[in-house]
Curated annotation (Swiss-Prot):
The active site is at H41 (proton acceptor), E68 (proton acceptor), H208 (proton donor). GO terms for molecular function: pyridoxine 5'-phosphate synthase activity. The record marks E145 as: Transition state stabilizer. It is found in: Cytoplasm. Homooctamer; tetramer of dimers. This is Pyridoxine 5'-phosphate synthase. Catalyzes the complicated ring closure reaction between the two acyclic compounds 1-deoxy-D-xylulose-5-phosphate (DXP) and 3-amino-2-oxopropyl phosphate (1-amino-acetone-3-phosphate or AAP) to form pyridoxine 5'-phosphate (PNP) and inorganic phosphate. 3-amino-2-oxopropyl phosphate binds at N6, R17, G209, G230, Q231. 1-deoxy-D-xylulose 5-phosphate binds at D8, H9, R43, H48, T96. It catalyses: 3-amino-2-oxopropyl phosphate + 1-deoxy-D-xylulose 5-phosphate = pyridoxine 5'-phosphate + phosphate + 2 H2O + H(+). It is an enzyme of class 2 (transferase). GO terms for biological process: pyridoxine biosynthetic process.
């Protein structure tokens, strides 16, 4: 199974103090030697990574780069030409991407065409539902990336102590039996979505909220060929170093 390391959270540490440390390019070099691709999200407000980071990584780091960006940031994708662009929704007030892309956006078809004309692979970050899979195929995307955020949130509510903390999600303060049912339902949505996507000749990736404990259920969905993981790897690296954190995740997703 392929691993994309999202290095945005290295930039989060850098921006916490507004200095040039830790060096995002150093993290990219290390990740490129251990993972199959680097994923970087350049947001409209540049709160974490910025276009200079993207430019440097593409210039000096000879690996596959997956740029996450909103439709409104597409000019930078066309300028710098990463290997792949994953189109994601974006809200200025969100801490992290909260849901899948709205595929009913009138601009989407034109944006996809422009990217493909520049030989850039196109991935759509979508919620796991069959309607969006079919639309992604009609839009002629190369990849879909299934949003695993709801799965990860339910897993955390069921198997960690998060519901006893200030980070609890009110809608997931439920009994264990209720959470188990929700978890299985979400896994079934992911399985069905991945199966349909593969049957429509879409490459299938997944990501958001995946960590060292919850990733196994996603690895077991054989139609998913790639995972993009960031926050949990960077969090683990605080204790064991980035190299070991990536290698530990690689071991968990090996088939």
């Amino acid at each position: 199974m392929l691993l994309g390391v999202n290095i945005d959270h290295i930039a989060v540490l850098r921006e916490a103090r507004k200095v040039n440390d830790p060096d995002l390019l150093e993290a990219a070099f290390l990740s490129a030697n251990l993972a199959d691709q680097i994923t970087i999200h350049v947001r409209e407000d540049r709160r974490h990574a910025n276009e200079k980071d993207l430019e440097n990584i593409l210039k000096y780091c000879k690996c596959v780069v997956n740029l996450e960006c909103s439709i409104d940031m597409i000019e930078y994708a066309l300028k710098y030409k990463p290997s792949r662009v994953t189109l994601v929704p974006e809200k200025r007030q969100e801490l992290t991407t909260e849901g899948g892309l709205n595929l009913n956006n009138d601009k989407l078809q034109e944006v996809i065409l422009k990217l493909k004309q520049e030989q850039i692979e196109v991935s759509l970050f979508i919620d796991p539902n069959l309607e969006d899979i079919e639309k992604s195929s009609l839009l002629k995307a190369d990849f879909i990336e299934l949003h695993t955020g709801l799965y990860a949130n339910i897993y955390n509510a069921l198997y960690t102590n998060i519901n006893q903390t200030s980070y609890a999600l009110p809608e997931l303060i439920l009994s264990k039996n209720e959470l188990k049912k929700l978890l299985e339902n979400e896994l079934q949505r992911l399985r069905q979505s991945a199966s349909l996507a593969k049957s429509l000749n879409l490459n299938v990736a997944a990501g958001h909220g995946l960590n060292y404990k919850n990733v196994k259920n996603i690895v077991d969905i054989l139609e998913i060929k790639e995972l993009n993981i960031g926050q949990s790897i960077v969090a683990r690296s605080v204790f064991v170093g980035l190299e070991k954190a990536i290698l530990e995740m690689r071991a968990l997703i090996k088939r």
